[in-house]
């Protein structure tokens, strides 16, 4: 943020039985990190209703969203989400943890913002992210990036997903050099994680990523409704003012 904005930042927590929210408030905007839980009475989609009410109350829009639940619930869940929150014009990364009951939802996490305009990032006819900016930087969050062809090999799907990240970033004048964080949700991760890393490292070498700041990354073993070998999320930052915004590597714990 700019010098003026950085001088005035307030972090508050809002908690209830249904919602846990961390709000970061600055003169330019409010950012909301929201976790919503299903109702204890078994009404799973109530978490979307509570989310929608919160967003309307605070005049906030969703940039990206994760849903943790059975893949069988995807179609009905997306309908419930749109009824509660309006047209879904942001990426929803829907993932199912191993051992989860196929008809169970466990929660949703949302990054939302008010006070700044969020422009959608589109790729292949889908909204795959949002981009917004302040005086010092442009920020991009991408989600639900996955291969179009899920019948090809897992290595080919991994390569296709990485290339989609690159293409999506290029539409907003960003590249891998601007990526600070990646999340890869990998189906059957233990059976091919080494292979996935080989594919990722090869592309990073080709693009010169290892010559700069390498994005922090997390790999998680989960399934997805598309049946893809991998689904990705990305956070990228492109500084306008290097005096106030900087990206640097930190040691891994």
Named regions from a protein language model:
Residues 1-253:
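Short, polar/acidic, helix-capping and beta-turn segments at strand->helix junctions
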């Amino acid at each position: 943020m700019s010098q003026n904005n950085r001088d005035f930042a307030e972090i508050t927590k809002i908690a209830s039985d249904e919602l846990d929210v961390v709000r970061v408030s600055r003169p330019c905007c409010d950012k909301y990190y929201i976790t919503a839980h299903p109702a204890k009475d078994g009404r799973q989609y109530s978490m979307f209703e509570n989310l929608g009410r919160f967003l309307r109350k605070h005049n906030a829009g969703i940039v990206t969203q994760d849903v943790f639940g059975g893949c069988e619930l995807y179609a009905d869940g997306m309908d419930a989400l749109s009824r509660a929150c309006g047209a879904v014009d942001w990426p929803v990364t829907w993932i199912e943890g191993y051992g989860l009951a196929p008809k169970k939802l466990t929660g949703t996490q949302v990054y939302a913002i008010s006070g700044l305009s969020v422009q959608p990032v589109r790729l292949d006819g889908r909204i795959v992210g949002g981009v917004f900016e302040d005086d010092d930087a442009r920020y991009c969050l991408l989600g639900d990036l996955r291969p179009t062809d899920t019948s090809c090999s897992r290595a080919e799907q991994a390569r296709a997903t990485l290339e989609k990240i690159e293409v999506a970033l290029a539409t907003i004048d960003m590249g891998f050099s601007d990526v600070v964080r990646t999340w890869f949700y990998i189906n059957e991760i233990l059976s091919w994680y080494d292979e996935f890393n080989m594919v990722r490292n090869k592309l990073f070498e080709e693009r010169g990523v290892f010559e700069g700041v390498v994005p922090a990354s997390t790999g998680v073993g989960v399934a997805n409704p598309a049946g893809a070998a991998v689904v990705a999320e990305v956070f990228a930052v492109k500084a306008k003012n290097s005096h106030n915004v900087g990206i640097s590597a930190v040691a891994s714990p």
